Amino acid sequence: MLGIGIITARKNKSSDDYFLGGRNLGGWVTALSAQASDMSGWMLMGLPGCVYAFGANQAWIAIGLLIGTILNWVIVAGRLRRYTIRAGNAMTIPEYLSNRFRDKHNILITISAIVIVIFFVVYSASAFASGGKLFASITKMDYHQALIVGAVVILIYTFLGGFLAVCTTDFVQGMMMLVGVLAVPILVVIVLGTGNIVPNLVNSGLNVDAKDYLNIFMQDGKPISGISIASQLAWGLGYCGMPHILVRFMAVRDEKELAKSKKVAIVWVLISLVLACVIGVLGRAYLYPMVLSNEGAQYE
C-alpha cells in the first residue's frame, strides 16, 4: 500500500491529478475502488455477522444494497460525470453543488461540507475499527496497536498519492475481498463436508428451527413483517449520496469506461453480497460451539 502511494505520487502534476486522478480512471479501477470502499468491513464482517446471529432474513439488507448500487450506477453515475465537468469542472461534491445551482453566497458548499465532515467522522471511525479488528485477528496484534498501524499506513499513502493512490489500493482490496468471499465457503464445505452443515446448524443453539433460520421470509419463528423488509431494503437508499462513491463517477475517463464500470461493479456486488450471506450461514455451522454474548463471541 505504501509502495502504491509512492508510485502514484509521481503522477500528480496538478490539483486535478491529486483530487480526481486527472479524471483518467479506467473502468475496472473505478468499479472495484467504488465498491470496495463502499462495502469495506461491513461486507466482510457486518453482513455475515448479521446472518450468523439472526438468520437468512438478514439477506434483505443485501438485496437493498444491491438495488441501491444498481440505481446509483444507472441513474447517478453518468449524469454526475457529465455535469461536474459542465459545472466549472468541479472537483468535489460541495463544489459541484455550489456551481450547479449558482450559489454565489457559498451556502450550499458550506452546508454540504459540514454535513460530510460530521457524518464521515462516524463513518470513517467504523471503517478504521473494522480494519483494526481484522488486522488484529490476522496478526495477533493488540487491537489498539493494529488500529494505529492501519490508520498510519492509510494516512501516509493518501497524503502521498492522493485520490489515485486511494483508488488503486481500493482496487487491490476489492480483488482481495472477492477472492476471500469465494474461498471461504469452499474451504468451509471441504472441512465440514456437505452432510454435516445442517446437523451443525441444528446443534448451534438456534432460537428457531433450522428451516426457519434458513428462510428469508421468517423472523424469530414467524413470517417476517413488511416493515422489517422495508427497513432492511432502505439500507440501499444511502448509496446515491455517499461522497466517497460519487467522486469515483466524477473521475472516470469517459462514458465508455463508465459503462464498463457499471457492469463490473454490479456483478462484483451481486457475487460478493450473496457469498457474504452464505458465509454467515456456513460460519454458524462451522463455529457452532461459539455463541454470542454481551462481551463478544465465546465458546461453550
Q: Where on the chain are the PLM-derived regions?
A:
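Membrane-embedded alpha-helical core segments of multi-pass
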Residues: 1, 68-76, 116, 157-161, ...
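Membrane-interface "cap" regions at the ends of multi-pass membrane proteins
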Residues: 1-45, 158-161, 186, 193
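Hydrophobic alpha-helical transmembrane segments
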Residues: 3-19, 57-62, 91-96, 121-124, ...
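Short helix-coil transition sites and intra-membrane helix breaks within transmembrane domains
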Residues: 7-10, 37-41, 84-88, 120-127, ...
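Short, Lys/Arg-enriched, Gly/Pro-containing loop segments at transmembrane-helix junctions
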Residues: 14-19, 85-89, 196-201
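Loop-to-helix junctions at membrane interfaces in multi-pass transport proteins
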Residues: 23-25, 29, 46-63, 98, ...
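Helix-loop-helix junctions that connect adjacent transmembrane helices in secondary transporters/permeases
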Residues: 52-160, 244, 248-300
